[in-house]
A protein has these predicted regions:
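A "functional boundary" signal
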Residues: 2, 32-144
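Bacterial Sec-dependent N-terminal signal peptides
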Residues: 1-46
Length: 144
């Protein structure tokens, strides 16, 4: 009859303990975001609603709600996404002064929150808007 050594017993106990810890860790709910924008999952449905209504006045209200909730949760990326909605709305309304203000606001928050992709989104959206309006000179000035 084989009598296990102390070393073998320790290895067996250690492997069972590792298996137990790993099993518990895998079964814990993940805190990661499960949406394409990697924002807080509680904010994603609000963003979707705001995005769907971006060409309507109601979209501005939903975007404001998104921003306020993102502030409470400390989600800086969602704060930037909330500022995209007004820019989209004013572009659809062809309101030059409000487009410029919405673009400036988005640029400021994106720089403050260190999400520069949204800075460039604001910048390129403005340029594309002016190009589509046959105002190439203004678009070139914005590009400089």
């Amino acid at each position: 009859m084989l009598i296990p050594s102390n070393r073998t017993k320790r290895e067996c106990i250690l492997s069972r303990l590792c298996f137990l810890v790993l099993s518990v860790w895998v079964s814990l709910p993940s805190a990661a975001q499960n949406n394409p924008y990697k924002i807080d999952d509680a904010l994603y449905p609000i963003y979707q609603r705001a995005s769907k209504q971006a060409r309507q006045q109601e979209g501005l209200l939903v975007a404001d709600t998104l921003y306020q909730q993102a502030l409470k949760l400390g989600d800086k990326k969602a704060q930037c996404l909330a500022y995209i909605i007004p820019l989209q709305f004013y572009i659809s309304q062809k309101d030059d002064s409000k487009i410029e203000k919405a673009s400036t606001d988005l640029k400021e928050i994106s720089r403050a929150n260190n999400y520069l992709q949204y800075y460039y989104h604001a910048w390129s959206s403005e340029i594309i808007y002016f190009l589509n309006q046959q105002r190439s000179l203004l678009a070139l000035q914005k590009a400089e």
